[in-house]
């Protein structure tokens, strides 16, 4: 049996003639090979990145982030303009948040969506206008809500009856009237991983359709709260607008019923727009998705003879995902017999599930390329794994890499701009890597990496006077 037809190889993965191509739909648009076969991103060599900042290393292409932010805003603005309404595009900060990224997306005209006190403080530290922040979360604490009202946050997406009462009391004490949206479970089952689907009934977020109507009625009774719209988020890594259209129909039904109680200026359809992680992933263009969503809302409003509200959306992954790569150095390489006389090469790198939890958490597929050189070697079925003491520490489950990959080579995994840094951990006492932004041939740290000393400093059993000897990896 050939490897290309074995159980070791996903149905979508085929053996290439050579394993050097950087697939355009997966990599940042600035990524390319230079004369010696190595890769540059944002005009910066992977060798320079390694030498200055070490590995593993998160690399984020600033121009790519900005371009995707502009594209998302333009897509929804154009779709909304066709129907004489406005679009409000919020960057979903949970995908990747730092002060610099907040500044980039705000520069490009986006508002920002946060879901914890920490994310709120990052956005504020970046200089974001609180009035252009939205606050999500199924279990916001009293202190989180106090802080949100204190700074004048634009909107709070309420998620439970308890939160409504809690927020109303806080706003009343402060003499404020807080704008709120009500998060709704529309019952739409998104075509995605179970942990990424968020609008079906049996999960922690939001109100049922019936419960949402009761929540709105209660909010309208409270003088310290202002109901401004409904919100629904059907999931993440979704490739077309069909699920959004179905969700929109149910939202508009509820919206129409609620109009009897007063004007409702906004309908927020959430985010979750997918990107390509491998060469076979084929998400619809954001322009097509935006048009499908907004047109669906327009159609549903027309059927019911009601005015169309403004539309809000919350893209995250589609803004930063393709803009990021993670750079690793190969440590060991070994080939094992995986059954039926089939071999698999295990390529171990100096990172792993501590810097990319998505394969372990969601079974997510990624791709990888040798980026320190090209190779004429026959591609070999490979699995890229990390250095952690865990069998599930898999970075790329199945990939064809050159058969001559060797210790010291540099590998890069593309499309790691979203939910890699955000989900990073210190598993096995591993310091989290720095994040470096590249643009126009220059690289700069936007999030400092951790050192062993940083981790040891949290251990209360170590005397404060103990010497420290381990430097940060991001020395510039």
Regions found by a protein language model. Give the residues of each.
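Active-site beta-loop-alpha junctions enriched in small/polar residues
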Residues: 92-98, 117-118, 138-140, 159-161, ...
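A charged N-terminal "starter" segment
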Residues: 1-178, 222, 226, 441-476
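General structural feature for long, well-ordered alpha-helical segments within catalytic domains
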Residues: 45, 61-64, 68, 72, ...
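Short acidic, glycine/serine/threonine-rich loops at helix termini
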Residues: 101-102, 125-126, 145-150, 167-170, ...
């Amino acid at each position: 049996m050939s490897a290309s037809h074995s159980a070791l190889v996903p149905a979508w993965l085929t053996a290439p003639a050579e394993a050097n191509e950087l697939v355009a739909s997966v990599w940042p648009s600035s990524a390319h090979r230079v004369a010696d076969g190595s890769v540059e991103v944002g005009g910066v060599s992977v060798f320079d990145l390694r030498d200055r900042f070490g590995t593993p290393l998160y690399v984020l292409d600033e121009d790519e982030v900005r371009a995707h932010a502009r594209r998302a805003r333009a897509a929804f603005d154009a779709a909304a303009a066709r129907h004489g309404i406005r679009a409000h595009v919020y960057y979903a900060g949970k995908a990747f948040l730092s002060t610099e990224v907040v500044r980039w997306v705000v520069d490009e005209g986006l508002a920002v969506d946060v879901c914890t006190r920490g994310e709120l403080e990052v956005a504020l530290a970046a200089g974001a206008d609180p009035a252009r922040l939205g606050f999500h979360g199924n279990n916001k604490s009293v202190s989180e809500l106090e802080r949100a009202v204190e700074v004048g946050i634009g909107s709070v997406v309420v998620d439970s009856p308890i939160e409504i009462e809690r927020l109303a009391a806080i706003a009343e004490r402060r003499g404020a009237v807080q704008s709120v949206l009500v998060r709704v479970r529309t019952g739409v089952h998104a075509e995605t991983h179970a942990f990424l689907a968020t609008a079906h009934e049996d999960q922690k977020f939001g109100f049922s359709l019936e419960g949402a109507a009761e929540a709105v009625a209660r909010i309208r009774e409270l003088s310290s709260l202002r109901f401004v719209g409904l919100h629904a988020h059907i999931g993440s890594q979704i490739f077309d607008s069909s699920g959004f259209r179905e969700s929109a129909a149910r939202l508009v039904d509820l919206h129409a019923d609620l109009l009897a109680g007063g004007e409702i200026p906004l309908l927020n359809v959430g985010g979750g727009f997918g990107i390509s992680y491998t060469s076979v992933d084929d998400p619809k263009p954001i322009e097509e998705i935006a048009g499908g969503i907004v047109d669906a809302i327009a159609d549903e409003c027309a059927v019911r003879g009601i005015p169309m509200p403004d539309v809000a959306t919350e893209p995250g992954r589609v803004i930063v995902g393709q803009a990021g790569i993670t750079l690793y150095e190969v440590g060991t390489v070994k080939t094992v017999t995986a059954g039926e006389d089939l071999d698999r090469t295990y390529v171990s790198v100096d990172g792993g599930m501590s810097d990319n939890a998505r394969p372990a958490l969601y079974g997510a597929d990624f791709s990888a390329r040798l980026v320190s050189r090209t190779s004429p070697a026959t591609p070999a079925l490979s699995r890229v794994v990390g250095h952690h003491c865990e069998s599930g520490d898999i970075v790329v489950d199945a990939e064809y890499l050159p058969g001559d990959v060797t210790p010291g080579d540099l590998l890069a995994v593309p499309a790691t701009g979203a939910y890699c840094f955000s989900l990073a951990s210190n598993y096995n006492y591993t310091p989290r890597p720095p994040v470096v932004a590249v643009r126009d041939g220059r690289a700069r740290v936007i999030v400092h990496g951790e050192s062993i000393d940083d981790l040891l400093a949290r251990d209360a059993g170590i005397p404060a006077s103990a010497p420290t000897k381990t430097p940060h990896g991001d020395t510039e």
